[in-house]
């Protein structure tokens, strides 16, 4: 299993276009899940003051939330960490961690956060359903006993998408940016049910 293909797409050039293309265009027209109307309010609703952001991206979501007192960014891609840190502001970020989510988390991150977010991470992970379950299980190591994990992902179920979404998903899988043809809401709910007492998908 190679966790690298998806992250290689995110460099300084692509990240400069990310907010426009992904958060404005694709979210609204391909995935029909508006950033401003759905995803950001959902993020704010589940956020805590001690928060771990897995998959730093451009830092868009934590940048638009001022109530995080202890924010840690975790990503395998150093450019994502750099860009997110720059956009959020170094004073607001307690730590950045370069780590592969397929591997167990460092002990200093265990049981430390009241919330963990995985926004647009799972569908980019290059691995099987079992591999993605391992990633989810690893991420739970960072949660306190009453902590919450939340996020957003793109299902591989074609019937859930319009024509634009189906075409875009095919292109992204072909390029190796997505690996989500076998991802489904039912599978995700089943996997999360093995890790948490309460699950909503």
Residue locations for each model-derived region?
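A short acidic, Gly/Pro-enriched loop at the edge of an enzyme's catalytic core
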Residues: 103-116
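A short, conserved alpha-helix within the catalytic core of class I
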Residues: 125-138
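C-terminal alpha-helical "lid/dimerization" subdomain adjacent to the S-adenosyl-L-methionine
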Residues: 150-199
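Short glycine-dipeptide loop
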Residues: 143-149
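Conserved class I S-adenosyl-L-methionine
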Residues: 1-47
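Class I SAM-dependent methyltransferase SAM/SAH-binding core
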Residues: 50-105
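Short catalytic micro-motifs in class I SAM-dependent methyltransferases
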Residues: 119-124
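Class I S-adenosylmethionine-dependent transferase superfamily signal
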Residues: 138-140, 192
